[in-house]
């Protein structure tokens, strides 16, 4: 379906079947789906009433939103990564939905589209704020996540997997902790100020420093052991992250 979809079920007291899995939505959930994204699923029970907003990309094609809507990462989140709202947040979100509904049912004039798009942007910006709160308030989950990511990358970087499959990808890392890549990156950004790709690079550089400092491997050999196809790519990343070339780092360490 070639629409952006924003759906909120404030009174949902059931479970959502997505693929082969069931997810608990007892708190209600605000869900975002990008155009042509597969979102097939079914509610097994509970109150299904709520709000659904479908927005065709052409509706805001001539507005700044067309360029920066991709910056709202939650349009790429999975069904089990919905935004769960507090009572105050529910009031805010429902007020915006109701305002949009009222505007759509009013007489169209020269300002209708401007007003609707401003409200859509308001909805998206509030959702950004509330997702940030969700990341922060679920600290126990966040701590476990960071520990698990550390374990996954340490195991990967110390195994032959690195030689055979190359540098770990964000997709691989996300699959190991059962998150979508976008949700993982946004959560990491809120916790440590880095997205998932930057986090992987940080761990690669730490491993590279270890090899440069404790072995006699050449820079090319270090690069290949870390999964780089081309030593130049490794040297470029190392210089970007440390302001030193691999050889300069080795000399300074010695």
Where are these regions (language model features)?
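N-terminal regulatory/effector-sensing and dimerization cores
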Residues: 1-78, 109
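Amphipathic alpha-helical segments enriched in hydrophobic/aromatic residues interleaved with Lys/Arg
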Residues: 74-122, 126-127
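A short, Lys/Arg-enriched amphipathic alpha-helix from helix-turn-helix/homeodomain DNA-binding modules
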Residues: 117, 139-177, 198-217
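C-terminal regulatory or interaction extensions
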Residues: 129-140
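Terminal helix-turn-helix DNA-binding modules in bacterial transcription factors
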Residues: 190-229, 251-254
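…primarily DNA-binding HTH/wHTH and HhH modules…
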Residues: 235-254
